[in-house]
Amino acid sequence: MATKRICVARIGAPHGVRGALKLWPFTEDPLAVLDYGPLTTQDGSRRFEVETAREAKDHLVATLKGVASRDDAVRLNGIELYIDRDQLPETDEGEYYHADLIGLAAVTAAGEPLGKVAAIHNFGAGDIIEIAPPSGPTLLLPFTNAVVPTVDLEGGRVVIEMPGEIEGDTPNHPEA
């Protein structure tokens, strides 16, 4: 089986005229991209070594080995940078990498299929799990122990306890 590749950053626009560029990390610690060694494109055909990086607002300003001019940096804009999954540290109990969850089957506690995990989002108020059913609109649910009581990575599934308001229950407040 091929090693799973994880996208850890995306190269952005140039920063200045000496080859520095914006780097958008997808890691919990933005500077962790320095710890993974050479980063590659998804197919592994191109390698990039981050020489320096500093935090700037919501991204990093980085220099890559061999990128010496603004023109060099412009040509890299939009490239996603990957590492092998086994380079990531082990997670604690009850913690998961988004990449390990995406693609898992989503089922009810009774085993009825709901779809597949399409994404994990965080818009500032906690993690949201996005479930893509075979047809119809996607479901966006809070990624909490109450709604997602079971994550079975080896079994390839998550169990979803649908909140009442999602199932179409009537509100518990009287009409005015």
UniProtKB/Swiss-Prot annotation:
InterPro entries: PRC_barrel-like_sf, PRC_RimM, RimM, RimM_N, RimM_N_sf, Transl_B-barrel_sf. One of its GO terms (biological process) is rRNA processing. GO terms for molecular function: ribosome binding. Keywords: Chaperone, Cytoplasm, Ribosome biogenesis, rRNA processing. Its main location: cytoplasm. Pfam families: PRC_RimM, RimM. GO terms for cellular component: cytoplasm; ribosome. Residues 93-166 form the PRC barrel domain. NCBIfam families: 16S_RimM. Belongs to the RimM family. Binds ribosomal protein uS19. PANTHER family: RIBOSOME MATURATION FACTOR RIMM. The PRC barrel domain binds ribosomal protein uS19. An accessory protein needed during the final step in the assembly of 30S ribosomal subunit, possibly for assembly of the head region. Essential for efficient processing of 16S rRNA. May be needed both before and after RbfA during the maturation of 16S rRNA. It has affinity for free ribosomal 30S subunits but not for 70S ribosomes. This is Ribosome maturation factor RimM. The lineage of its organism: Bacteria, Pseudomonadati, Pseudomonadota, Alphaproteobacteria, Hyphomicrobiales. The gene is rimM.
